Amino acid sequence: MLNNSRLCIIWLFGLISGFNLMITGNTLNYWLAKEDIALQTIGILSFITLPYSINFLLAPIFDAVQIKYLNKIFGHRLSWICLTSSALIFLIYIFSFLDPSTNLLLFAFTALIISFFSAAQDTILSALRTEIVPKESLGFTSGIYIFGYRVGMLLAGSGAIYLSIYLTFNEIYKIFAGLVFIYLILLIVGIKYCDLNENIHIQIIKNDIKNNQNKKNIINFIYNALKPIGSVYFIILILIFLVLYRLPDNLINVMINPFLLHLEYDAFEIASVGKFCGVVGAIIGGLVGGVIMKHKNILNSIFLFGIIHALGHILFIFLEINGKNSLLLFITIGIASITGGMTMTAYIAFISALCQGKFRATQYSFLSSMMGISRSIFPIISGYMVVNFGWQNFFLFTTIITIPSLLILLKIKTKLQ
């Protein structure tokens, strides 16, 4: 049974991950849309979050390599957290002086580097979370983690857009740099207070990597790390499912800011209804999903939540047909966010449940990287889809594309039984 202090730490992990993601994700996307950057370009720039797709390549390093001096002071995981946080603080502050309308290439490159360190930190936090949470508590703690994740998104998303009424985005990103510093202090204090004993576990992993001659390169290491999960065919099925299940949301997320600006909503309406209510709904959905999964197994939950969430996407079509309508926007965002929070909770719990053995960090990072591929690579075409087929067909596609992922899930369920 987890005590309250550890639950708070798990919540803080989620908050930091959600906050960091928004810095180079939706908030950056809104900044670009406000600068009237072309839809096709905005879609292409979703690649900025690409490091989240390949962070599993870094997981073996975080598992095995110690930062000599910091490790003595903070311990293995926390020393890596300190290093990545320091890099983020510096880079975000530098980024706050750039302008996408005058030098888009430098702007995008710097954002990509920030995304790299954000993804690296996300990998470390996820590994630490899987180490301190018993398997039987994964469903409930996933809800706590997603709660924190959504609060982080709220701060860096809705909060930033609301502040853009009064401040420039350059000023807002300076504030972001300061908040990342505060989060680092909270993490150091929280982890030290909880006295998380990770060093024995890490030393076992380090020795195993060093002594096992089959793990001479990264590919062999990942292959051996994934063996406890199942056969190659089974893992491929899981990877395809993980990409497709999150694809509808990720396509919409890249285009939601241009869509709301297209309907002529202002910054306050987008921040309050489009973002704040959306994040609150996602938090509620995450908590509801966590509670449901305490009484219903993860596979059945993720299937049910996926169907409900897909139907919610149809409301965006009605919003496009009706035009600017605050009540309909509230209903659409509310339903999409609550059901989205439920699916995300089940999704994280599903990945966590698959991880087993000594190399959970590598397993979790590799599997969760599929969420990154779904978020970074495929949405590149979203702008072209809207320009060539229109908003209504775009949202119809996001509803239909859910079906293949659910069919694959049924196949996975059969394999597990």
Swiss-Prot record:
Keywords: Cell inner membrane, Cell membrane, Membrane, Transmembrane, Transmembrane helix, Transport. It comes from the Bacteria. Pfam families: MFS_1 (PF07690). It is a multi-pass membrane protein. Gene3D superfamilies: MFS general substrate transporter like domains. The chain crosses the membrane at residues 7-27, 42-62, 78-98, 104-124, 143-163, 171-191, 225-245, 273-293, 301-321, 328-348, 366-386, 389-409. GO terms for cellular component: plasma membrane. One of its GO terms (molecular function) is transmembrane transporter activity. It is found in: Cell inner membrane. Belongs to the major facilitator superfamily. NCBIfam families: 2A0125. This is Putative transporter AmpG 1. It comes from Rickettsia conorii (strain ATCC VR-613 / Malish 7).
